[in-house]
């Protein structure tokens, strides 16, 4: 071991110690900051997480049932799986408005066997894997088709994008370990993370790749004699790894892509695949994520290695509307709340998930408040002790999110309404402008 290795080891030990201390502080304060926390240790890390759109309310029970879409990252040490998890969440304090002392989270109720914390009085939250499907290599990203949630697309380390019809696979994976996707989307030669189903045109899907391309497939063109499908178009505007891609939520022909070339490109599929409609150098570092507003057709956000989230107006991309700054490391993912037009979340390598409310930009602050961050920063989730890999808002529970991390942890959490209290219920999408 040379001197540089020793210094690196010392730095890693110091960082782990700091992380552990911060977690102890977070755990101590959690009952006052959250209405709900479920922490579950998976067998292997998941690089992806997404709520499925269904929700069940069993008769006579004080909980609701939700499903999560997860993957595995075994680093070649074990079989990889596409996974479906069932989550039971207590109705009181979650779907309801109760925040009494007896219904709040009791962090002393920690289940060592399940690696879970989180309960409300008589009802304990639970997360369990209910279906596993063999997968070829790690799953970098998995997303369900908005028009048919049984159709799941996955980005593989092989460079291929796989389509699985969940209903055609048993809940228990076949013992031979063979991956049997229903459709294999070909056309890219390296792995990637960006994956986006069109919310407006069923069966249209985009994938971003480290080979600098974005591919567009229409699975309606798939024919059964051959389970592979070539792309309808391959977009070649980036000069480095394409990190993320997303369809526009209101215009079926538009999508955006971002990459390590620091570029944000806006594409129109009716125009040539080598000529983006707009091109802008969005950040001073690599751009890792983007998301179009679900409410306002003009607004989108980008997350970058320069530690900031950029807010953009499609009508004038020459000037960034605003920069959200509080993270201390690169931004890994961004996503908009489905319940509040001005609210979004960002996950960072600093192990934090930040919640932002754009309607609060420019509000006056006391010096003490300013020390905690800008006025638009409304909550910091500090429950992860390692880098978050993905995050998603619940479609059913206001303010509830799930986030996964590199240390096998997947969390379901909901900040206390008393802490959030944004008071933005009366805002319209135009307030973003």
UniProtKB/Swiss-Prot annotation:
Q: Report the source organism.
A: Mycosarcoma maydis
Alphabetical list of SUPFAM superfamilies matching this protein:
WD40 repeat-like (SSF50978)
Query: Which protein, by its recorded name, is this?
Result: Histone acetyltransferase type B subunit 2
Gene Ontology annotations of biological process type: chromatin remodeling; regulation of DNA-templated transcription
Q: Where is this region: Interaction with the histone H4 N-terminus?
A: 368-372
Gene Ontology CC entries for this record: cytoplasm; nucleus; Rpd3L complex; Rpd3L-Expanded complex
Positions of WD repeats: 134-174, 187-227, 237-277, 282-322, 326-366, 383-433
Q: How is this protein organized at the quaternary level?
A: Component of the HAT-B complex composed of at least HAT1 and HAT2. The HAT-B complex binds to histone H4 tail.
């Amino acid at each position: 071991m040379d001197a540089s290795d020793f210094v690196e080891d010392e730095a890693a030990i110091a960082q782990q110690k700091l992380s552990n201390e911060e977690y102890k502080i977070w755990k101590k304060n959690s009952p006052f900051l959250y209405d709900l926390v479920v922490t579950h240790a998976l067998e292997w890390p998941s690089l992806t997480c997404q709520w499925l759109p269904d929700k069940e309310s069993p008769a006579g029970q004080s909980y609701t049932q939700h499903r999560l879409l997860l993957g595995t990252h075994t680093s070649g040490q074990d079989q990889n799986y596409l996974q479906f998890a069932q989550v039971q969440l207590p109705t009181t304090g979650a779907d309801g408005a109760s925040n009494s002392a007896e219904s709040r989270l009791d962090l002393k109720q920690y289940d060592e066997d399940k690696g879970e914390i989180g309960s409300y009085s008589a009802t304990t939250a639970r997360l369990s894997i209910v279906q596993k499907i063999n997968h070829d290599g790690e799953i970098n990203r998995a997303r369900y088709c908005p028009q048919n949630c049984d159709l799941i697309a996955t980005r593989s380390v092989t460079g291929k994008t796989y389509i699985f019809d969940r209903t055609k696979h048993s809940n228990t994976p076949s013992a031979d370990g063979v991956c049997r996707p229903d459709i294999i989307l070909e056309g890219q030669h390296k792995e990637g993370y960006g994956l986006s189903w069109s919310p407006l045109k069923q069966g249209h899907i985009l994938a971003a790749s480290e080979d600098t391309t974005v591919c567009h497939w229409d699975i309606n063109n798939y024919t059964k004699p051959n389970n592979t499908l070539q792309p309808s178009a391959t977009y070649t505007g980036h000069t480095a790894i394409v990190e993320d891609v997303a369809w526009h939520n209101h215009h079926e022909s538009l999508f955006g892509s971002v990459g390590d070339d620091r570029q944000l490109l806006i594409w129109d599929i009716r125009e040539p695949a080598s000529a983006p409609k707009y091109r802008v150098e969005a950040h001073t570092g690599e751009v890792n994520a983007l998301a179009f507003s679900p409410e306002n057709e003009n607004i989108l956000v980008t997350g970058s290695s320069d530690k900031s989230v950029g807010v953009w107006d499609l009508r004038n991309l020459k000037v960034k509307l605003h920069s959200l700054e509080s993270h201390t490391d690169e931004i890994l993912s961004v996503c908009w709340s489905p319940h509040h037009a001005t609210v979004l979340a960002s996950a960072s390598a600093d192990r934090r998930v930040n919640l932002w409310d754009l309607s609060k930009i420019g509000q006056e602050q006391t010096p003490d408040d300013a020390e905690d961050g800008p006025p638009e920063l409304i909550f910091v989730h500090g429950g992860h002790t390692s880098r978050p890999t993905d995050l998603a808002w619940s479609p059913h529970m206001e303010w509830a999110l799930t986030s996964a991390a590199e240390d096998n942890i997947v969390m379901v959490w909901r900040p206390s309404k008393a802490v959030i209290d944004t008071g933005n219920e009366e805002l319209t999408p135009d307030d973003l402008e």
